[in-house]
């Protein structure tokens, strides 16, 4: 198989300094997560099941974090030892200025979760010029999740395939994300599914898992009606997912294959103990993507103070 970007190898080789900073911070009573999700956008040109936008409810524009405030967050987080950011929304590509600020932090990786419909020649060049920003194409549009409720499923599928081909032609590092359900897991956790992505030079898949955290997080407010308890995996199904991934790793060792739950936990090695915190569009800092516990607000305290235990 071809050699492509491997997240785990990057962490082992280039993450030593960041790990050292996190350890130093921990000794000072500051609990720094490995990953930080940042809801940089509340706007989106689509409405699809599984979208994080269903968890963001902001009434007024003035409540949102400004470009400069996001810049300050990225800088402080990097100093504390956070090297991996999940830029979510909404549609992050609608916040070009924030992405340009993120691109300045060359020692960090920013995974940009996008539907792909706004990717064009200009954005392809932008990602080519700023290799620390990694497009993550959301494949829920073509993974058999409530397609009858989407309306634009055919358009989204064609757009995603076009975006993959455009990114691969420029040799841009990119990944995909898909929400695992009891209905689709036997299709998206297969060699056939991964072979199709591999042929398009996809560098990895992040499988998102709904769990007990759904419905209990801050800002849920009913969320997206397409999501309900029926889409969550049972504990038995989660164990099967772990075993399937172990087998797939053997054949796709040059692809990044991980699962992440809404409670902020990875299923299986090597990130099983890594934590994912979240910063909402209003600057609230939570201890998980689902927003189970609010730790503070960045307009009242800086990140270091909020993470102080």
Task: Give the predicted meaning of each segment.
Residues 96-98, 122-123, 146-147, 217, ...:
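Short glycine-/acidic-enriched loop or helix-start segments at secondary-structure transitions
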Residues 136-140, 144-274, 278-295:
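Radical SAM enzyme [4Fe-4S]-AdoMet core and its adjacent flexible, acidic
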Residues 2-125, 129-130:
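Conserved alpha-helical substructure of the radical SAM core
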Residues 92, 119, 180, 210, ...:
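Hydrophobic pocket-lining residues within nucleotide cofactor-binding pockets
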Residues 83, 133, 203:
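Conserved acidic residues
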Residues 80, 106, 130-131, 170, ...:
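Helix C-cap/helix->beta junction micro-motif
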């Amino acid at each position: 198989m071809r050699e492509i970007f491997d997240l785990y190898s990057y962490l082992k080789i280039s993450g030593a300094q960041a790990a050292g900073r996190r350890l130093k911070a921990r000794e000072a009573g500051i609990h720094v997560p490995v990953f930080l999700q940042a809801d940089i956008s509340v706007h989106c040109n689509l409405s699809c099941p599984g979208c994080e936008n269903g968890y963001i409810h902001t009434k007024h524009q003035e409540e949102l974090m400004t470009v400069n405030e996001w810049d300050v967050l990225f800088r402080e987080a990097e100093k504390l030892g956070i090297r991996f950011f999940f830029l979510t929304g909404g549609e992050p590509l609608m916040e070009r200025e924030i992405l340009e600020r993120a691109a300045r932090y060359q020692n960090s990786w920013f995974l940009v979760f996008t539907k792909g419909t706004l990717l064009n020649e200009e954005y392809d060049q932008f990602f080519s010029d700023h290799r620390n920003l990694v497009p993550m194409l959301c494949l829920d549009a073509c993974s058999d999740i409530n397609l009858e409720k989407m309306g634009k499923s055919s358009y989204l599928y064609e757009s995603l395939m076009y975006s993959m081909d455009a990114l691969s032609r420029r040799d841009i590092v990119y990944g995909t994300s898909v929400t695992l359900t009891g209905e689709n897991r036997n299709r998206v956790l297969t060699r056939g599914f991964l072979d199709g992505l591999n042929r398009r030079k996809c560098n990895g898949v992040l499988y998102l898992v709904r769990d007990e955290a759904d419905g209990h997080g801050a800002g849920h407010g009913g969320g997206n009606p397409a999501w309900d308890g029926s889409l969550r995996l049972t504990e038995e199904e989660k164990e099967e997912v772990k075993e399937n991934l172990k087998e797939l790793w053997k054949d796709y060792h040059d692809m990044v294959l991980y699962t992440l739950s809404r409670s902020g936990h990875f299923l299986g090695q090597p990130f099983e103990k890594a934590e994912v915190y979240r910063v909402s569009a209003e600057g609230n800092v939570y201890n998980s993507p689902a927003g189970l516990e609010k730790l503070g607000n960045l307009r009242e305290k800086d990140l270091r103070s909020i993470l102080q235990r």
